[in-house]
């Protein structure tokens, strides 16, 4: 007999807004071991990032060679990013020195290099989350129908899908909590990279989440509001509202 899950089986993971960008060969500064990516992003020191080659027309994996000194799939850590210029420096270790770049790589259009937040990370002290998806319909009922005994039904075609979500997170004295980042991200103009991973049933094995046994919904989002609640009768909390920016990906089977 199936067992009903409790809310404590769930969890909320998040990739911050403004942490994804594409760049070309000319953006790689070999002399200074820097990369000139987009300006006014939201990359912070110690953010874990990964590099890849993507096809900018399809969004899928592209063809090309990353700059020498950077390995696809390897986690690097931001040691410097200047929003006004877009200059990025990364290290192979947390708090380490900048990597050495010896060649600017190869990426011919429509291919480009991409840097993105390594993976959604756990948001601590989450009270709850909710996510609703809807589908609209367009009324295409026509006149001139033959009338019979029963009232005729309307006819519809598929419209657009949409959704909305929210999460309530308790405020703690830990400045590194991603919930603080989420509040700031609401006002981030470029929210590319913001992603919620909504676990319905999170299974941990060996100290790490086992996604093959867990069930989750991954959805790129736009954060629309943050409402802070401070009063003497309750734990301090912040309510974050969001909407999908792309279609969600459902992983609702344990396999």
Sequence positions of predicted segments:
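Short, acidic/charged, Gly/Pro-enriched secondary-structure junctions
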Residues: 13, 176-220
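Intrinsically disordered, low-complexity, charged/polar segments
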Residues: 92-120
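Solvent-exposed edge beta-strands and adjacent loop segments
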Residues: 2-27, 114-174, 214-241, 248
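Generic short beta-strand segments
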Residues: 49-56, 168-172, 199-203, 224
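Autoprocessing Asn-cyclization modules and mimics
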Residues: 4-7, 14-89, 94-97
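Surface-exposed ligand/attachment interfaces on beta-rich extracellular proteins
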Residues: 26-40, 58-71, 101-107, 120-124, ...
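Residues on the solvent-exposed faces and adjacent turns
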Residues: 53, 80, 92, 221, ...
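Extracellular Ig-like/FN3 beta-sandwich strand-entry sites
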Residues: 73, 162, 191-195
């Amino acid at each position: 007999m199936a067992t009903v899950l409790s809310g404590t089986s769930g969890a909320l993971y998040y990739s911050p807004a403004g942490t994804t960008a594409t760049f070309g060969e000319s953006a790689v500064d070999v002399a200074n071991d820097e990369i000139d990516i987009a300006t006014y992003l939201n990359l912070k020191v110690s953010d874990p990032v990964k590099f890849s080659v993507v096809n900018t027309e399809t969004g899928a994996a592209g063809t090309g060679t990353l700059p020498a000194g950077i390995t696809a799939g390897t986690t690097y850590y931001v040691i410097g990013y200047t929003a006004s210029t877009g200059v990025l420096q990364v290290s192979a270790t947390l708090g380490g020195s900048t990597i050495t770049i010896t060649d600017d790589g190869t990426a011919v259009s429509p291919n480009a290099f991409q840097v993105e937040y390594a993976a959604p990370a756990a948001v601590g002290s989450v009270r709850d989350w909710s996510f609703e998806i809807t589908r609209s319909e367009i009324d295409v009922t026509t006149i001139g129908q033959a009338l019979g005994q029963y009232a005729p039904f309307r006819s519809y075609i598929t419209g657009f899908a949409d959704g909305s979500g929210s999460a309530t997170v308790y405020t703690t004295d830990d400045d590194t909590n991603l919930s603080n980042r989420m509040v700031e991200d609401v006002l981030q103009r470029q929210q590319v990279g913001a992603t919620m991973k909504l676990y319905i049933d999170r299974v941990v094995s060996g100290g790490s989440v086992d996604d093959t046994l867990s069930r989750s919904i991954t959805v790129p989002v736009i954060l629309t509001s943050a409402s802070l609640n401070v009063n003497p009768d309750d734990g301090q909390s912040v309510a974050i509202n969001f909407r999908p920016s792309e279609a969600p990906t459902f992983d609702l089977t344990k396999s």
